[in-house]
Amino acid sequence: MSTQDRVNLRVTHHFSAVPERVFDAWLDPEKTKKFLFTTPTGQMVRVEIDARAGGKFRITDRRDGEDVDHVGEYLEIDRPRRLVFTFTVPKYSTASTMVTIEIVPKGSGCVLTLTHEGVLPEWADATKGGWAGILAALAAEL
């Protein structure tokens, strides 16, 4: 499948927390394990984050007795405005995609816009729903 066949997704969420708190949660393993790629029946078994441009991450959730890795590399870290990373879930696809998180202050909180580029069409609905759930879980943790 060519990259032309892929889709881009966008999810927006309003947070009552300040941009710095929202941004920092994405790079803090203790916070990340509570909201990122967690599932209701899963168990977080590993969170490795090298929070620098060129650094890598690996987040592993155990689902129904099977480990599911979420891996990527940080391409840009501009606290508290922008975070860009590659993203792959090897169990489901070897295709690498790109995620951009942009955070803009709004009132006493902020608005986060997450753009996921290069998603396979058959995964678009599940991926968009997954990101919406992740952002809601992040809001609950903050």
Predicted regions, residues:
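Beta-strand/loop substructures that line and gate deep hydrophobic ligand-binding cavities in soluble
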Residues: 84-133, 138
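Hydrophobic/aromatic beta-strand elements that line small-molecule binding cavities or substrate pockets
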Residues: 13, 47, 70-75, 97-104
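Structural motif
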Residues: 5, 16, 77-79, 106
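Glycine-rich portal/gate segments that line the openings of hydrophobic small-molecule binding cavities
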Residues: 43-86
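Hydrophobic ligand-binding cavity/cleft-lining segments
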Residues: 1-42
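Intrinsic-disorder/low-complexity, polar/charged segments enriched in Ser/Thr/Lys/Arg/Asp/Glu/Gln
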Residues: 6-12, 44, 56, 69, ...
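A generic structural micro-feature
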Residues: 3-7, 49-51, 64-68, 91-95
